[in-house]
Each structure stands twice: as structure tokens, then as C-alpha cells.
């Protein structure tokens, strides 16, 4: 049962808790940032393109904090577009108003307006990132968010000699908002990107390339690469010629050491990997190519180019202009390499591993579906049918007049319905549109089987959960069956906030709903979000002030 905000006792308890929380925040260090979002002209691929960027930077400014810090980011929207910012992977405990997905937790920041996001970084360490969460703006509005151990603490691995953020992106030579608008209007998929980028630049294999990101390293040192896939729609293979990696964290969750020469990142993923500079002195390409989980079907529309950066050994014997060594990349359709990476990750060994909850309160199976719906009146260039996507047959639609979180807090009827189905619909059931959420009792344990279709071509969907990390208990190919339960890893499963559900396969996740609010659960291929591949969990309040949805901040944007 949701405890109404109008309860005078709960208001008093919340007031007392807020005073304690304010004192706690005051005692913590506060990292203050100002993001000015404006148009800027950038030259790439022999063209000049106007993009939306933060503080004139691509990637945008890096946020660096220690675990336990408070963060305040004033976002000034000087762009012509509505805008929100999402702090991807931040748990937002009791700060759901700062999560950022447009029309889920807030109305957008309108042009010539501002909003200050305030949240704490508690119980998290590693590499996360921030990005726009409205339209395709996140193609250029993104940046790294680094959380280091609090003072006096250390990494659970040998301290690196050097840390290097590597933010991977996709580049279009057209206005990305127009690209999305054209796709939605026509009911078709958006065109593929024109290039990939490493820290905002393409590298020297593209036409008119005049800038390449270079990492200068010393021999026989350990470099911590903080790799982020900020791309919109493409899974990526990542390699450095002549070097191997030891993965130590994903999605700001520590892992058991995992050695590989190929990192695989779905959109939204982060990987912390140690690289030892034990190769011969020289220069080596860092290469990025697409993993196209649809290949070789004719549905594939993936950028087939290669972005590069350079790892340069800074010695007297190394020539700066020497041609770097190129790594041998996997084939774009190499699902075996992708699955080996995703399936091979484990959580840290005991006793460091967090305990997996064993009593499950809510069991769900969510089928990820692609299909078609009739064109609607807003799709001016659509003919007959429009591409669509759904979870359990429901193609998700955002509200237009009020955010879901405001509707939950104010108990406003008519904004959403709490009838999202717990299981796939019978075969042949038509896809429907709706703003359906799944209510969860506070502190309930939820297990979800995510199933990709196996009867026709599908693709690897990176599914992102806001507000929580989850345990990945099992993954496999084909259809999930009850017999797969015996294979659950309840000892050292990896924790993530974004999971790549394999093509023609399944994955099982489990989490505890201990964070009241409205939490988006959606595909992180941005092309699939307006198509409807998402839903929302509405987590009820608990019974104590530290489990109760706080009121909205005074400067929360209005619709």
C-alpha cells in the first residue's frame, strides 16, 4: 500500500529525516559543476556540422568525485531543444527527481531555462557517465563520471600508474535531432552513423581526419582504461594492438579479474580494464569497430568504419610519427566473441561479493519484441505501417503533460496505468500502445527473465535499469526453460545496470526494489526508445522516512 504524503505523521518524520540528511550532505564534500548547453560548429569528415554540446566540449566535461560526495550540477539550456540530463548508473537513493529521463522523472528543461541536479554518490565506485535523455541529443551531449574510493580507501586491485578515460561515440554529419525526427515521422529506422569517435575525434583512417587521440605511456607500467560506450545505437569491439586487458569492473561494479584481448561494450556499458605496457617500444592503434548482432541479415544498418586512437610508448627510441600497429579485429557478426565476453564476467570473490537475495517476491518474464503498428496522425511521412517495439506486447508511450514521478507523488489519475503484464502475451496477440507501469512493494526482490525472440531475426538489446544495480544470474541462447534455473549463479554473479540480452537468447536478473520512485527500464539502443521498447517500475514508499519518496525540488522544471 502506498502511504499518502498527506499523512501528518509521515510529513513530520520526513521533515526530521530531511534535517538529518541535510546535515549529512553538509558534512560531505560537494562537487559543483555548471553545464552550459549550446550549439557549436565542429568539422568532421570534410564537413562542418552544428552540434549541441556542453561547455563547448566533445565529450563534455568530466565529473570527478569520491565515494560519499554530494554533487550539484546546474544545467543551463542555451540550445533550441528541450533537454534533460541522466546520470547513468547513479542509484539516486532518495533523489529520484535528479535521475533525468524526460517525462519519467521530470519535465524537460526548456530553452533559456535551467535546473540544478543534486544527488549523492553513496556506495558506488568506478566509471559511470552522464548523457542527455531526451531525443537523440545524447549523440553529442555526454561525458564521463568518475567515482574514486573515498579518502583513505584504495582500489581492490593494484593501484595503476596512469588512468585514461576513453569515451566512445557515434558521429553523424547531419543534425541528430532531425535524423530522429525524420525516422519517427516516416515510421522507419534512423540512418546509421557516419563514423565512430574516441574521445570526440575519429582518428586518422577517415577522410579529412585531422585529429587523433593519443595516449602517451611509459614502458612496464599499468594503465587503467575507463572505457565508456556513449554511442547511440551500436555495440562496439575495442582492442589495442599487442596488448591484453584485465577487466576489474563493469558499470561501476567490481568484478573478478577477467583477462581478454577484446572488450565488448553495448551502448551504455562501461568497462574498467588494466593494461600493462609490456610490448616493444613503439606505437599501437587502439581500434573501435561495430559488433553487428543482426548480421548477416538484410535488416542490418550498421556503420562499418573503424575509429582509432594511438597508444604511444614515450621513449627516446620511439618515433612519434611511426605507423602504428593495427590489431586484428573480430568480424562484425562475431557473436561468439561478444557472448564469451558477456557470459564470462563474474563478481568479485567472497567475502567482497555482495550477497544475492535468495527469496524472490516477484517473478516476471519480459519478451523483447520488434514489429509494426499503424502509422498515427503525427507521422506525416509514414505510409501504412510504422516500425515498433514492445515489452510483453506493450509498446511504451511517455506521457505528455506530467512526468510519471509527479503523477506518482501527487497521486494524479489518468497519467499511467499500473497493469504492465508479468508475462508475454499469447502468440498472435496484437501489439498495443500504452503507458503501463509495474508497481513494486518497497524492498521486494524482483527476478526477471529477459527473452529475445528465437523464431525470427532479432538483435542484442542492451537493457538499462534506472535506480538500481542488478545481479546477472544466468545468460544463454535459445528459449529460457525451467531447467535453466539450476544453472543460476548465486555465488558470484556480476552486477550491472545495463545488460546485453543476446541475439536469440535470454538473461536472468535479480534486484531489490529498495528505492521509491519511478524507474525507467528500457533498451539503450536509442532508435528503439521512441519505438516503444521500455517500461517503468513504480516502487512504493516504505514505512520509514529513509524509505519515503521526498517532495520535488522547488526548481523542478514545469511542463
From Swiss-Prot:
It holds the Pfam family Cu-oxidase_3. Keywords: Apoplast, Copper, Glycoprotein, Lignin degradation, Metal-binding, Oxidoreductase, Repeat, Secreted, Signal. One of its GO terms (cellular component) is apoplast. Its EC number is 1.10.3.2. It is found in: Secreted, Extracellular space, Apoplast. Gene3D superfamilies: Cupredoxins - blue copper proteins. One of its GO terms (biological process) is lignin catabolic process. This is Laccase-7. It is an enzyme of class 1 (oxidoreductase). Glycans are attached at residues 32, 47, 82, 112, 120, 151, 210, 220, 257, 278, 314, 363, 443, 484, 541. It catalyses: 4 hydroquinone + O2 = 4 benzosemiquinone + 2 H2O. Residues 36-152, 163-316, 396-543 form the Plastocyanin-like domain. Residues 1-28 form the signal peptide. GO terms for molecular function: copper ion binding; hydroquinone:oxygen oxidoreductase activity; oxidoreductase activity. Binds 4 Cu cations per monomer. Cu cation 1 binds at residues 86, 464. NCBIfam families: laccase. Cu cation 4 binds at residues 461, 523, 528. Its cofactor is Cu cation. Lignin degradation and detoxification of lignin-derived products. Cu cation 2 binds at residues 88, 131, 524. Cu cation 3 binds at residues 133, 466, 522.
